[in-house]
A protein has these predicted regions:
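Active-site loop-to-helix "anion-binding N-cap" substructures in soluble metabolic enzymes
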Residues: 2-276, 281-349
Length: 349
């Protein structure tokens, strides 16, 4: 592989662009986004952005990946729902999904004619890996009258066995709107518990049965840490994801999807924020709201952190077979019906 050459002026301009965007980021222990770091990023981001044009590619970046990917080469950044919409709308020949494998599968489900690649095939998900399509079929035999709702953090074969997909931003409204009383919710047990609590609060009568998966990032937070943070930082706002435990969600000032958390912080005046989510989101907030103060407490997703500029470049330049997402067409169509049902039922902004 021959590295492309860029002029000193091109490299300096790219370094300045990156440093201006990333100078406030401080979200991953042991990493820096100072000027020297941006000098190291610049040849890669220039090469990737050149390759995107040559390959007719679009790069989708989840908010949990590192800032140099999001702001250096990403075409769209956001949560699972937003990025699934962008995949559905894409006309590009290639989609590079800087996230985890189930997200790239979702992009392939929604954009079947595109070549969809994932930078690291090892980027799994504790939720998505907790149940298979066979597991869902077994549960359906136990609860034949249940409507099967799958969280978007699930594999393509699980989506193919489900009636409707949901995200953390639309789960409450979609489940509340379903005519069935009995809901089989996979794979997130803690989100199911939060849905149960929210629907009870709304006066909606549903029996929610769940599988036993949890997110290794969000199930790690606890109310004792929240109480300690409130004692140390008067006026603190606590922001949590619905993948947290119901106890943590109840102790928070705001609970919502990644995108909703971003909006809440941007629109809320407070001296401090505690973000009970993945540290990548804190990185985005540090970049986009440098005037806000974040006190730490976030957690790292080891799967999201497998993404790197080098791997994005390699996936664009000459993707290996393991980086290319392939799906059986019958399975893809069944999974697409599940996701399309979500788009039909999701509240319109």
């Amino acid at each position: 592989m021959i590295a492309p050459s860029f002029t000193p002026a091109e490299l300096e301009a790219e370094t300045e662009r990156l440093f201006k965007a990333l100078m406030h980021a401080d979200c991953t222990p042991g990493r820096s986004w100072n000027y020297q770091a941006c000098q190291g990023f610049a040849p890669l981001t220039l090469e990737i952005n050149r390759l995107k044009k040559e390959k007719d590619a679009v790069i989708l970046t989840h908010s949990y990946v590192e800032p140099e990917i999001i702001y250096g080469v990403g075409d769209f950044k956001g949560d699972s729902y937003f990025l699934s919409l962008k995949a559905r709308e894409s006309k590009a020949k290639m989609i590079v999904f800087a996230g985890v494998v189930f997200m790239a599968e979702t992009a392939k489900i929604l954009s079947p004619d595109a070549t969809v690649v994932v930078p690291d095939r090892g980027s799994g998900c504790s939720l998505a890996d907790s149940i298979t399509g066979d597991g869902v079929r077994s549960l359906k035999k136990l609860y034949p009258d249940a409507t099967v709702v799958c969280y978007i953090n699930s594999t393509a074969d699980v989506k193919a066995e489900s009636d409707v997909c949901v995200t953390s931003g639309n789960v409450y409204d979609i489940v509340a709107s379903l005519p069935a009383r009995r809901i089989l919710f996979v794979p997130d047990r803690l989100m199911a518990e939060n849905v149960r609590a929210e629907l009870k609060h709304r006066g909606v009568d549903k029996e929610i049965i769940s599988s036993d998966g949890t997110c290794i990032v969000h199930d790690d937070f606890n109310v004792a840490a929240v109480a300690d943070a409130r004692a140390r930082f008067p006026g603190l706002k606590v922001v949590a994801h619905p993948e947290c435990t119901p106890e943590v969600a109840a102790a928070a000032d705001f609970v919502g999807s990644t995108g909703a958390m971003m909006k809440y912080v941007k629109n809320t005046a407070a001296p401090y924020f505690l973000m009970l989510t993945e540290c990548g989101l804190v990185g985005r907030l540090q970049v986009e709201t440098p005037e806000k103060n974040f006190i730490g407490g976030c957690r790292l997703c080891p799967y999201m952190k497998l993404n790197s500029l080098e791997k994005v470049r390699d996936a664009l330049l000459a993707p290996r077979p393991d980086q290319i997402v392939t799906l059986d067409e019958n399975l893809r169509q069944r999974a697409a019906r599940c996701i399309d049902r979500m788009f039909e039922l999701a509240p319109k902004d």
